[in-house]
Amino acid sequence: LVCQIDLLESIAKLVNVDVKNTDSQELLDVFIGKSAKGRTSLVIEANTKTAFRQGDWMMIPPYPGDSILEEVNIEMGNDKEFQLYNLKKDIGQKNNLAKAQPKKLKELIKNFELIRGDNYNNVEKIELK
């Protein structure tokens, strides 16, 4: 698991520059193929909302709003309840396992809130201009 933000710390190491960035992780060996071990988790943001990836699991907190942005026919990830997906078995995120896997959901919520805080649902409404 890697993220484009990890390029900052990784390229900095490559050119021997010291940078201080709490979001970026130095994963140069992963990017150049010397290692397959990247991040264990990642907070993901889209449309002003955040979700949490940990290993094969994706947790999307409840957010208000329409599940589909009709003007452009884009799925927004909004739901009244938590969503939990095993991406190894369900890459399309069709089978919400939140009710079937309450311990896993609780673990991901806890780890997400350690990074993001518990005010994650205070988001702006997306506006097309």
Question: Which residue stretches match the model-derived regions?
Answer:
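Active-site-proximal N-terminal segment of extracellular/periplasmic enzymes that hydrolyze or transfer
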Residues: 95-103
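Intrinsically disordered, low-complexity polar regions and short flexible loop motifs
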Residues: 90
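A general alpha-helix detector
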Residues: 10, 93-96
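Residues within well-ordered alpha-helical secondary structure of globular protein domains
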Residues: 13, 33, 100, 110-114
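Exposed alpha-helical structural elements
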Residues: 26, 104-107
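A generic structural signal for ordered secondary structure
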Residues: 84-86, 98, 109
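Charge-dense polyanion-binding interfaces
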Residues: 107-129
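C-terminal cap/loop subdomain of S1 sulfatases and analogous C-terminal strand-loop tails that border
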Residues: 3-83, 87, 119-124
